[in-house]
């Protein structure tokens, strides 16, 4: 179709169906290194439309988009992402991603062999990511809006700390990461349901890795966005810590770099021996007995550090300390000294209160 006053310019075009088989797309980063390879077994586009004049940005739409068996090799070969199926329906404003996996390309034992520095080995799976009430355009510019985002995930992170940590820059915080997305987005309601997160680390060759995890994880947020014109994102998180302790935390992620991030919450109650895996791996200490009544905390933080308070209410805490050169043998004198210090602190401060 052509406008009568601009006969030389293409106004719109519509293609009823486009089908692609075995697509490969390669993306190079700013250093001219291959950053990602994406393979699609099949891509189907129905009702594809372009509506544009030279005076305006290119605007394109489609009625439905489906893809199967998507594979993305990324992160410099450390991980592969697969999506079994993706489908977008414009009339329903609905995007559904099925069976999303993040697969490490090397085993836990092989990761240190391929990388001479500390690298997170990530394994993840989501049954589905579902965007409802999805629109892609706002006043001729791309702005992704959704009424609701529903998802679940299982996430395992492993870090071998035997290798040196060669990171020389400060870790980016959530708002900075979100603002790196090329497309602005706003989700009215974010719901993460019945998910799982575990972190495991190996500190010494002669020690077993330590592990902590959070089950029955739920995350809720309203107006979740990467639009820096907004003040912040607020996330409410609940979970079971080590399958035993009830946990509730609220996070505030500001977009203004002059405002600090905030976190506050509590964990109640569980046996402190549940922490033995991570304690022995990190500091060669195991809890012999003792229960946590309540752990509450509130702190502000940024890239450089945190400041806040923690209250640790516990009962009957006794520990064993182990010898560095023989991690399976109890260091008797060190154990006596630590337990005596715990008793003294309990007399001075019935609930251990301190600064973060």
What are these regions (language model features)?
Residues 107, 158-160, 319-323:
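Outer-membrane beta-barrel proteins
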Residues 1-93, 171-261:
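Elongated, acidic membrane-bridging lipid-handling scaffolds
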Residues 103-104, 205-207, 255, 314-316:
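Short, surface-exposed beta-strand-loop junctions and turns on beta-sheet-rich folds
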Residues 1-27, 43-48, 63-70, 94-136, ...:
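Extended amphipathic, helix-rich lipid-handling scaffolds
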Residues 140-141:
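Short, T/G/N/S-enriched strand-turn elements that build extracellular solenoid repeat scaffolds
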Residues 252-254, 266, 277, 283-356:
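Extended terminal
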Residues 127, 235-237, 249, 263, ...:
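Hydrophobic residues positioned within well-ordered beta-strands of beta-sheet architectures
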